């Protein structure tokens, strides 16, 4: 339910800037959000609406990160915008290591090799396998949503080798 609430907040921020947005959930939410279907997501995207996926996959044992990557792969997304409680990917946990360095860009191979736990392993592997870059940015700053949607760089981009 928390992802649905967060998704509705993101939708509100986008709509305040004039960007149409639609929340699609893995389970019925009445008038609040529409149940996910690939066809509906693709139709919204074709009309220029930002689609926000919420509620995971609707199946146990799958994280919301894995759900985001799965949905992105299903619709052929160019990039995943992943708002987190951290502002990007670091060489170590910045809360524990004051020398941790934030990456502007990092490869999936390095994330996996160094066990950088920015997304869970299945999500990272699925994004890598489907060649989908992921922009990880801080949800704490509401302006970040507008920044990333308008193409401004913030956070870290996780991608394949260049």
Predicted region positions:
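C-terminal catalytic "cap/lid" subdomain
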Residues: 1-162
């Amino acid at each position: 339910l928390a992802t649905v609430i967060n998704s509705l907040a993101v939708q509100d921020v986008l709509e305040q800037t004039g960007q149409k947005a639609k929340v699609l959930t893995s389970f019925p939410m009445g008038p609040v959000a529409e149940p996910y279907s690939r066809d509906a997501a693709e139709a919204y995207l074709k009309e220029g609406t930002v689609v926000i996926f919420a509620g995971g996959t609707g199946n146990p044992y799958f994280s919301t990160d894995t759900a985001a990557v799965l949905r992105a792969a299903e619709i052929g997304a160019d990039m995943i915008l992943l708002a987190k409680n951290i502002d990007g990917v670091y060489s170590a946990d910045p809360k524990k290591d004051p020398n941790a360095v934030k990456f502007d860009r990092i490869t999936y191979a390095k994330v996996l090799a160094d066990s950088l736990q920015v997304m869970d392993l299945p999500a990272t592997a699925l994004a890598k396998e489907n060649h989908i870059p992921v922009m990880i940015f801080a949800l704490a700053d509401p302006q970040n949503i507008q920044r990333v949607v308008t193409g401004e760089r913030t956070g870290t981009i996780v991608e394949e080798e260049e």
